[in-house]
Amino acid sequence: MADVPTGPPRVDRAIDLLWATFHEPPFWAALELWTAARTDPPLRAALRTEEPQLREAIRAVADGIWGPEVTGAPLYEELCELLFTSMRGVVLVYAFEERPPATDPHVALWKRLAARMLFPEGHADSQG
């Protein structure tokens, strides 16, 4: 993302990239493991010990995508939690409904919310 400027344009691009990761095979494999773990105690125990490390690795990649201007924002931690949980929930519809992820109406919403949370003063809302 070296070619993407800082500020809202970078946030828009970061959200596009993060959203795309929720449509890749590794995410769907993880989702299937989580679902199976609900009724498989040994699998649940194994995932419980590994999940924090995976989450930390994913977060490190996300931090690199966002860049230092964004990761230093006071509401960055809250924004990441909001985006990850929201994207994880929204993507479930794609398990049974084929549609282009880039046109999902949530993408524009996430971009507007991110701009408001990260740049509350002096930056226009991103329109996505």
How should these model regions be labeled?
Residues M1-F27, A73-L83:
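Hydrophobic alpha-helical connector segments
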Residues A2-T6, R38, P42, V70:
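Residues in soluble alpha-helical coiled-coils and helical-bundle/repeat scaffolds
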Residues V4, T49-E50, E97:
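Residue-level signal for well-ordered alpha-helical positions
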Residues F22-L31, P41-G67, E78, A108-R112:
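Amphipathic alpha-helical packing segments from all-alpha helical-bundle domains
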Residues R44-A45, I65-G128:
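Hydrophobic/aromatic-rich alpha-helical bundle segments in the mid-to-C-terminal region
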